[in-house]
């Protein structure tokens, strides 16, 4: 394992950590970076590259689990009231998270092979980036015209299910899970922070499940020679995601979704021009 290969692992881990939970599409960015670094450089087989992506995604998942550790313990009944809303009898439940997960989980299971075969390209990512940006701009426009639910514990079952339906849009590479669900939550009456909190918590089980299935699928591609590459990528993804998630949650109610939408449109247009 050369220093150059470890540098590539670090870059890929950083890209994953920066984009996994920001509403800019980590899958889209990884497809772009994959074309530039992994495939063009022939660093590893396609199977091994897929396993690497799963490993660095697990680094990002661990970061979010740490940020939301109190909430997770509360959901599991291991920690009592952590907010004033819970003192008043309002509380986000595991059932609400579950109903939010169902739509995307079912569609993802049914169309996984089709999505992998036909939608994982730079062109489809560019389309997803622009389409998702339009949804985000619409969400911010709607948000200015209604009073929003400002805490996670006041989310209704109806809102949880509807946000889950919006998550189905993220099955299109480039659309972004957080972009679609935060936008959906805002359109449905949540403020940006509550929508982001629900998005990140809801993402953990579905991402862990998908990562586990993918890791099992590509298990034969793992080898001891690649372990340093995988470890560097995992650590970089974890550290960067830990910083990004905390920073994003602190600012999202102030900056809204417009800056991310502008970035997505610019990147999407550039990619489409390159593909012409």
Swiss-Prot record:
The residue ranges crossing the membrane are 48-68, 92-112, 119-139, 155-175, 196-216, 225-245, 255-275
Pfam assignment, any one: BacA
Keyword set, alphabetical order? Antibiotic resistance, Cell membrane, Cell shape, Cell wall biogenesis/degradation, Hydrolase, Membrane, Peptidoglycan synthesis, Transmembrane, Transmembrane helix
The entry's localization annotation reads: Cell membrane
Tell me, in one coarse class, where this protein mainly resides. membrane
Q: Name one GO biological process term.
A: regulation of cell shape
What domain of life?
Bacteria
Q: What is its EC number?
A: 3.6.1.27
> What does it catalyze?
di-trans,octa-cis-undecaprenyl diphosphate + H2O = di-trans,octa-cis-undecaprenyl phosphate + phosphate + H(+)
Membrane topology, record value: Multi-pass membrane protein
GO cellular component, as recorded = plasma membrane
Molecular function GO terms recorded: undecaprenyl-diphosphatase activity
* Additional information: Bacitracin is thought to be involved in the inhibition of peptidoglycan synthesis by sequestering undecaprenyl diphosphate, thereby reducing the pool of lipid carrier available.
This molecule's function is given as: Catalyzes the dephosphorylation of undecaprenyl diphosphate (UPP). Confers resistance to bacitracin.
Q: Which family does it belong to?
A: Belongs to the UppP family.
The identity of this protein, by name, is Undecaprenyl-diphosphatase
Which organism does this record belong to?
Bacillus subtilis (strain 168)
> Which gene is annotated as encoding this protein in its UniProt record?
uppP
């Amino acid at each position: 394992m050369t220093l150059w290969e470890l540098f590539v692992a670090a870059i890929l881990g950083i890209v994953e950590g920066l984009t996994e939970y920001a509403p800019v599409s980590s899958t889209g960015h990884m497809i772009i970076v994959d074309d530039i670094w992994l495939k063009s450089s022939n660093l590893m087989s396609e199977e091994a590259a897929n396993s690497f992506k799963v490993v660095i995604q697990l680094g990002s998942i661990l970061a979010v689990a740490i940020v939301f550790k109190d909430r997770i313990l509360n959901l599991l009944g291991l920690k009592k009231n952590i907010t004033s809303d819970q003192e008043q009898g309002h509380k986000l439940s595991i059932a609400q998270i579950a109903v939010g997960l169902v739509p995307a989980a079912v569609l993802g299971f049914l169309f996984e092979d089709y999505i992998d075969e036909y939608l994982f390209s730079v062109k489809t990512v560019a389309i997803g980036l622009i389409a998702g940006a339009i949804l985000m701009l619409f969400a911010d426009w709607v948000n200015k015209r209604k009073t929003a639910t400002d805490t996670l514990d006041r989310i209704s079952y109806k809102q949880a299910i509807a946000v889950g339906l919006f998550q189905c849009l993220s099955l299109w590479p480039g659309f972004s899970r957080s972009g679609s669900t935060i936008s959906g939550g805002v359109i449905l009456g949540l403020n940006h922070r509550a929508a982001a909190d629900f998005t990140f918590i809801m993402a953990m089980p579905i991402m862990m499940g998908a990562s586990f299935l993918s890791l099992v699928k590509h298990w034969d591609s793992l080898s001891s020679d690649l372990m340093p590459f995988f470890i560097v990528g995992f650590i970089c993804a974890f550290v960067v995601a830990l910083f990004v998630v905390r920073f994003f949650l602190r600012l999202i109610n102030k900056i809204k979704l417009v800056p991310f939408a502008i970035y997505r449109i610019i990147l999407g247009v550039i990619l489409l021009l390159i593909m012409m």
